[in-house]
A protein has these predicted regions:
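Bacterial N-terminal signal peptides that target proteins for export
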Residues: 1-7
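Extracytosolic ligand-binding ectodomains
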Residues: 2, 21-360
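Sec-dependent N-terminal signal peptides
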Residues: 7-14
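C-terminal motif of bacterial Sec signal peptides marking the signal peptidase cleavage site
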Residues: 16-19
Length: 360
């Protein structure tokens, strides 16, 4: 007979798929009716002996660096998942432990934090946020047999590398976002575009995917300008984008360095050109962060979303209950929730913690 706490956990885990599907995907709902057989006829069940150790997970989000304005909101999605799991009885009869670490959107910072959380017993990591950061620390996680599930790694590069079964992501590849962004440009009647992008795995992957999809749809890419991720001055890159003379500009940026791009763009009069942004700057506070007031009004963009339905509604109600401002969601917070739930499902299903989580 199943433990009632396990049934409660299953109800919580039904929220998991909030972010894994696209807006056009339909998930069939299946009702399962359960009944208890009489004691005299109940067949013996095969069970897995639960681990005596608690499930220890780590949240490795950018609490400093270029994505610091997004990190806490994403991490809150993971914390919400742990809170709900523990309210339902935990995993294998014990509360899940969540350790918070800072990835800094920087390989060196993230590696230090990863080693620290591993030393504290972390068996799974929700993170990192930045694609390049995850690429920098993945080999260390694999060597330690620690599962990494990222809520926001969108670089197409992850599809190509050998992850040894210790890496997954709950956000879609930018091959999809590039196609959607190109479609948006075409729908708006844009025929020529210039792109300014970060020179990292995220930026290059999305810029190339967008350019390929836009050209396949009959558009023309005037120029692609990449900026160094550690740069502090971007005027020359902005000037180069402006010289392209395109009808629209695509910005594949992060908040802090993105402000370094948008400020000279404002000074050079380029913000009068239609801009299309991506998930890296999906932050309601971007204009304030950049000190640009209403200059960004009218910008359009793309970002991974969640399929409409009961699961999405339930997540947003729960997230609003724990967020400081009552916001129902935050970019990649649903995917962070899913990442933790997936690791928890594996641990619960297999009655284990540690490297065996990867087999789930």
């Amino acid at each position: 007979m199943k433990n009632r706490k396990a049934l409660a956990l299953i109800a919580i885990l039904a929220l998991v798929a909030v972010a894994c599907g696209g807006a056009d995907e339909v998930v069939d709902e299946v009702e399962v009716e359960t009944t208890e057989a009489p004691a005299t006829t109940e067949a013996p069940a095969t069970t897995v002996a639960p681990s005596a150790d608690p499930l220890v997970l780590a949240s490795l989000m950018p609490l400093s660096g270029d994505l610091a304005s997004l990190g806490p909101g994403i991490a809150l999605g993971a914390a919400l998942a742990v809170e709900q799991i523990n309210a339902a009885g935990g995993i294998n009869g014990q509360p899940v432990v969540l350790i918070e670490g800072d990835s800094g959107c920087d390989g060196a910072v993230a590696l230090t934090s990863l080693n620290d959380v591993i030393a504290q017993g972390a068996q799974g990591v929700m993170g990192a946020a930045c694609s390049g950061t995850s690429l920098a620390i993945l080999d260390t996680a694999i060597a330690a047999e620690v599962v990494m599930v990222s809520p926001s790694n969108t670089s197409p590069q992850f599809t190509k590398i050998d992850k040894k079964g210790f890496y997954a992501r709950t956000a879609p590849s930018d091959l999809l976002q590039g196609d959607v962004l190109a479609s948006l440009l075409v729908e708006d009647g844009v025929q020529t575009v210039s792109i300014i992008s970060r020179a990292d795995s995220y930026g290059r992957g999305l810029a190339e995917a967008t350019a390929a999809a836009f050209e396949a749809a009959g558009g023309t890419v005037k120029t692609i300008v990449y900026h160094a991720t550690d740069a502090t001055e971007f005027s020359s890159e902005v000037t180069a984008v402006g010289k392209g003379g395109a009808e629209a500009i695509v910005g594949i940026l992060f908040p802090e360095t993105g402000c370094g791009v948008l400020q000279p763009a404002f000074e050079q009069g380029l913000l009068d050109t239609p801009w299309y942004m991506t998930d890296g700057v999906k932050d309601a506070g971007l204009a304030s962060l950049c000190g640009l007031g209403t200059a960004l009004d009218g910008f359009k963009g793309t970002a991974p979303g969640s399929a409409a339905g009961e699961a999405k509604d339930a997540f947003e109600a729960a997230y609003a209950g724990v967020s400081a401002d009552g916001s129902p969601t935050f970019i990649f917070a649903p995917q962070a929730y899913d990442a933790v739930m997936l690791m928890a499902i594996s641990a619960a299903a297999n009655g284990v913690t540690g490297p065996e989580i990867a087999s789930g």
